[in-house]
Structures are given as structure tokens and as C-alpha cells.
Amino acid sequence: AGQFSELSGSFSHIKHIEYVDQNPIGRSSRSNPVTYIKAYDDIRDLYAKEKLSKVRGYQAKHFSFNVDGGRCETCKGEGSINVEMVFMADVSLPCDTCGGKRFKKEVLEVTFEGKNIDDILSMTIDDAIAFFQNHKQTKIIQKLQPLQDVGLGYVQLGQSSSTLSGGEAQRIKLASFLVKGVTKEKALFVFDEPTTGLHF
């Protein structure tokens, strides 16, 4: 591991090194691409500004599945319930209360241009960018664009990180650096097994 035949270039220009491995982007089943790159904060703010949200007193936290408020109380925002099996592996079943949508029915009644928060999380990156472009949500697009740029346009915004491959996890990590923007300092990215799942 770590062997190479030659390393050349102007090393004096490199100010820091980023090691990108294939470890999952989050340990929680609630972790997903859109939360990792911080775009979900802007999406939640968008829904909190809707007229129905203001009437009902909903804040951005009501559109989070990590805290109490708007998430389904039965599955705690997981969208599924684990059933313990005595002699077999546990079985994960869709939550009967929310139908796997992770939020309370009342929260799902809040829509932005006809789409509720579950509809947004079910969109692919490509579809979400097109949707937000149609409605001029530049700030959200700027954060989603790097995911498309690294070839993850097919992934759903709310797809659990546990279902992503090692190569996909690497791409999301790379996208998160791109979201932060270009700086004057030069960085060297070192990828763990870059030929595994990570090619453009």
C-alpha cells in the first residue's frame, strides 16, 4: 500500500493534502448525499418560508428527520422499522405510520412548486438540479452541481449512505470539497484505490 514509482512536480505550491478514502460518508442511516454537502440546510429553509409553514409555525427543523418536530414519531425519521428475528437476521420493514416517507403527514402537506419534502428527497441529483433551475434556486443548485460534476447525477438526494458503494462515497467526499469553492491554496488529493469505482 502506498507504493509508487515516481512523484514529480512543484511541491512548493501544495499547501495541504486531502486523503479521500472509501469509508461511508456517515454512520447513521439518515446520512445521505444532500446532508453531507450541506445542501439540505438550504432546502429546509426553503420549505420553512412557504406560506403554510408560516401559518402552522413550522421552522427549518420541522423538515429534518434527525430531530423531533416534523419527523415521523414511530420510526424517528428512519422510514423503516427493524423487526428482531430470533433465529435469523433482523428484518427492516417500511414504517406503517409514514409509509417510508419519514415525516408526519402534516409536514408533507407543505409544498414548494407542487413538491413536498419527500418528493425532493426522492429526486435524483439530475432531476433536482433541473427542478431548482426552473424555479431559480441558485444557492441550492451551486451545492448540488458538484455531485453531478463527479458523475453522481443518478443518485437520489435522500439515498441512505449505507447503500452507496465505496467509489460513490469517494465521489461525494470530492464533491463536498468542490462545494467549498476554489481557494488560492493548492491541494493534493490522494485517493484510496482510485481505480475502484471512481473514474470519469
Which residues does each predicted region cover?
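Conserved phosphate-binding elements of NTP-dependent enzyme cores
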Residues: A1-F200
